[in-house]
């Protein structure tokens, strides 16, 4: 049966770059690997074909010869003493030629002989704890007590997993390597040892308290210092307070993620605070003062300029939130909301009507608006 064109095998054009060739090879190799196609007898042959094509096209000299002579470049008779396999005989060591690709695809695949398991001790996992605080607590800083369920080192075996504190022994399945090898057609594949789970050691007499795990589940009570200035999304790291390590390995870390609750009066934007303050129509028109609360528990008197409109903002410097890492505090912005009176008495209504008759020149924005409306309609009808 005639060999297929190598470019066709990889599904690329003849002008494909080295990166495009490698990407195409990785895709094909992953798709056709015997481990993933145990029920497809043709996959192994196709897998070999893909490897053969890539072995040629990845090498600049072989590729040049193939582009010029085709498959004949690798068969007997093409000058230069290539022997029965031709000038570029297919005797490459695929284990070394493709190790960089397969390590990406399948993990520790096609490696050398290696040694014992890299580390019998394993670091514990990191933990996440979501903690809600009030805006007042975020302003002042606070000490919080939290309960964290986590795996901790077993007291009975001191984390070894063995009864009576005995030492683990070398795994008989992998001889301490943590991996086992299996032949898959054309290749030798390494997998994590199923007996010791890659640890390289086993426990002959498991601890009765932790069943050989070396860890037990336990709820711990921790005290956490929340600094002033935290905001939603702030992350606090507590080193060594995560899951306990395996076989004497170090513990992971605990990460506290802060969520600041909404406040009834203040809205926050970084270090600045906003407060919407209602004022009477007379105070807005004539001017006056209003007392506003501040986040520190006090209050400040703010002057309202005569003629203030809804939305007017005034700033109280330094009355916002403290910066988390120092640098002073933000500001507090006060936004006026002019209230329209409701439930008017007959006398109040009478006074307002009288006021309206006298206030034609006192509403500049309204006058300007209606002038624009008139101009708009005149333009439509003219």
Curated annotation (Swiss-Prot):
Zn(2+) 1 binds at residues 154, 157, 207, 210. The gene is dnaJ. Zn(2+) 2 binds at residues 171, 174, 193, 196. Belongs to the DnaJ family. Pfam families: DnaJ (PF00226), DnaJ_C (PF01556), DnaJ_CXXCXGXG (PF00684). CXXCXGXG motif repeats lie at residues 154-161, 171-178, 193-200, 207-214. Keywords: Chaperone, Cytoplasm, DNA replication, Metal-binding, Repeat, Stress response, Zinc, Zinc-finger. It is found in: Cytoplasm. Participates actively in the response to hyperosmotic and heat shock by preventing the aggregation of stress-denatured proteins and by disaggregating proteins, also in an autonomous, DnaK-independent fashion. Unfolded proteins bind initially to DnaJ; upon interaction with the DnaJ-bound protein, DnaK hydrolyzes its bound ATP, resulting in the formation of a stable complex. GrpE releases ADP from DnaK; ATP binding to DnaK triggers the release of the substrate protein, thus completing the reaction cycle. NCBIfam families: DnaJ_bact, PRK10767.1. Binds 2 Zn(2+) ions per monomer. One of its GO terms (cellular component) is cytoplasm. Homodimer. GO terms for molecular function: ATP binding; heat shock protein binding; unfolded protein binding; zinc ion binding. One of its GO terms (biological process) is chaperone cofactor-dependent protein refolding. A zinc finger (CR-type) spans 141-219. This is Chaperone protein DnaJ. Its main location: cytoplasm. InterPro entries: DnaJ, DnaJ_C, DnaJ_domain, DnaJ_domain_CS, HSP40/DnaJ_pept-bd, HSP_DnaJ_Cys-rich_dom, HSP_DnaJ_Cys-rich_dom_sf, J_dom_sf.
